[in-house]
């Protein structure tokens, strides 16, 4: 039986979306937390930008849902997010020569990567084809609009892919850059389109504990208060692509009002460790509630980009872990069974919950990239991320540009077309 035969999805009712269930899982582990004191600033940034290597064991099955934008009639059997990678030799739409905005850390060819076969694959959904990204079509849809990516460094990775794709049609103007290069604004004057990166670690307000005058890597998260770094811009946005996960793989304490209601990776008698997925669920729930209760956000479209997995093998980031594969996994190598799918399932459940509570014309949907990216261990920078001060460490969290991450924008355009 093929993977697709195993994964028939029963439909259910969502006002703007389709839902379904799957039973397949991926079984992977993360190591115990490893706190390094006195690292250089660069090493600290790398740790914070990437997935902390923490073990997360799932001891129960999860009723997993797949949420899809409601298709047009002629596409009623098209599941954009369930499929396989198939050979394709058209190559990438852009190169590291034709896109001037690729950051050094994602410019894998410039940093010495020689193999190129990882570019010769395209995502093939069940029962339909996913068109290649069309910058003209995209810019026509978002003409006169503002779109923001809300999230961490993987969200930034996503927006960097989009910038490369759009710049083949129109080169954007840098409109804003903060002192840490986290919050950015680009403007496409011909189409009057504004693109924003709104950085957030946890979606909700978080404060790092200081112990003996030093940063501890332990955070207090306040579920009653969202991160104003993104929330204060909501009223100006037409589209939001929201994501988060990697910052939660560390010791955190969840506060509601004046009470600590739960924690992650703590060992205290009077506090319950509810795990990463629970903490993420509460953060997304708070974020979606903020959007739904925004009185000046009528008509805003919110898309949740699901969890993007890492692919460390033979260790973890700090124990020699690497990601040296040069081609995708096939479906026989994927066993859906661990935390990646618990997180993804939770995210889809929360976006469905938000959609059911949608107010004042607000719309919610999903960019479900998890399945596609679980199959792409070959797409990470690995050793080719260009940091001369961290030789021996590999980036198996972010994605090369160009690379498999570009499919996220193929999917984004397909979803926007269905909404348009």
Swiss-Prot record:
<keyword id="KW-1133">Transmembrane helix</keyword>
<feature type="topological domain" description="Cytoplasmic">
    <location>
        <begin position="1"/>
        <end position="30"/>
    </location>
</feature>
<comment type="function">
    <text>Xyloglucan acetyltransferase that catalyzes the acetylation of fucosylated Gal residues on xyloglucan side chains. Predominantly catalyze 6-O-monoacetylation of Gal residues in the Fuc-Gal-Xyl trisaccharide side chains of xyloglucan oligomers.</text>
</comment>
<dbReference type="InterPro" id="IPR026057">
    <property type="entry name" value="TBL_C"/>
</dbReference>
<feature type="transmembrane region" description="Helical; Signal-anchor for type II membrane protein">
    <location>
        <begin position="31"/>
        <end position="51"/>
    </location>
</feature>
<keyword id="KW-1015">Disulfide bond</keyword>
<dbReference type="GO" id="GO:0016413">
    <property type="term" value="F:O-acetyltransferase activity"/>
</dbReference>
<keyword id="KW-0735">Signal-anchor</keyword>
<feature type="disulfide bond">
    <location>
        <begin position="108"/>
        <end position="400"/>
    </location>
</feature>
<feature type="disulfide bond">
    <location>
        <begin position="99"/>
        <end position="164"/>
    </location>
</feature>
<feature type="glycosylation site" description="N-linked (GlcNAc...) asparagine">
    <location>
        <position position="212"/>
    </location>
</feature>
<dbReference type="GO" id="GO:1990937">
    <property type="term" value="P:xylan acetylation"/>
</dbReference>
<keyword id="KW-0325">Glycoprotein</keyword>
<feature type="active site" description="Nucleophile">
    <location>
        <position position="153"/>
    </location>
</feature>
<feature type="active site" description="Proton donor">
    <location>
        <position position="395"/>
    </location>
</feature>
<dbReference type="GO" id="GO:0005794">
    <property type="term" value="C:Golgi apparatus"/>
</dbReference>
<feature type="disulfide bond">
    <location>
        <begin position="78"/>
        <end position="128"/>
    </location>
</feature>
<dbReference type="GO" id="GO:1990538">
    <property type="term" value="F:xylan O-acetyltransferase activity"/>
</dbReference>
<feature type="active site" description="Proton acceptor">
    <location>
        <position position="398"/>
    </location>
</feature>
<keyword id="KW-0808">Transferase</keyword>
<protein>
    <recommendedName>
        <fullName>Xyloglucan O-acetyltransferase 4</fullName>
        <ecNumber>2.3.1.-</ecNumber>
    </recommendedName>
</protein>
<feature type="topological domain" description="Lumenal">
    <location>
        <begin position="52"/>
        <end position="420"/>
    </location>
</feature>
<dbReference type="InterPro" id="IPR025846">
    <property type="entry name" value="TBL_N"/>
</dbReference>
<dbReference type="Pfam" id="PF13839">
    <property type="entry name" value="PC-Esterase"/>
</dbReference>
<keyword id="KW-0812">Transmembrane</keyword>
<feature type="disulfide bond">
    <location>
        <begin position="323"/>
        <end position="396"/>
    </location>
</feature>
<feature type="glycosylation site" description="N-linked (GlcNAc...) asparagine">
    <location>
        <position position="324"/>
    </location>
</feature>
<dbReference type="GO" id="GO:0000139">
    <property type="term" value="C:Golgi membrane"/>
</dbReference>
<feature type="glycosylation site" description="N-linked (GlcNAc...) asparagine">
    <location>
        <position position="96"/>
    </location>
</feature>
<dbReference type="Pfam" id="PF14416">
    <property type="entry name" value="PMR5N"/>
</dbReference>
<keyword id="KW-0472">Membrane</keyword>
<keyword id="KW-0333">Golgi apparatus</keyword>
<feature type="short sequence motif" description="GDS motif">
    <location>
        <begin position="151"/>
        <end position="153"/>
    </location>
</feature>
<dbReference type="InterPro" id="IPR029962">
    <property type="entry name" value="TBL"/>
</dbReference>
<comment type="similarity">
    <text>Belongs to the PC-esterase family. TBL subfamily.</text>
</comment>
<feature type="glycosylation site" description="N-linked (GlcNAc...) asparagine">
    <location>
        <position position="192"/>
    </location>
</feature>
<feature type="short sequence motif" description="DXXH motif">
    <location>
        <begin position="395"/>
        <end position="398"/>
    </location>
</feature>
<feature type="glycosylation site" description="N-linked (GlcNAc...) asparagine">
    <location>
        <position position="270"/>
    </location>
</feature>
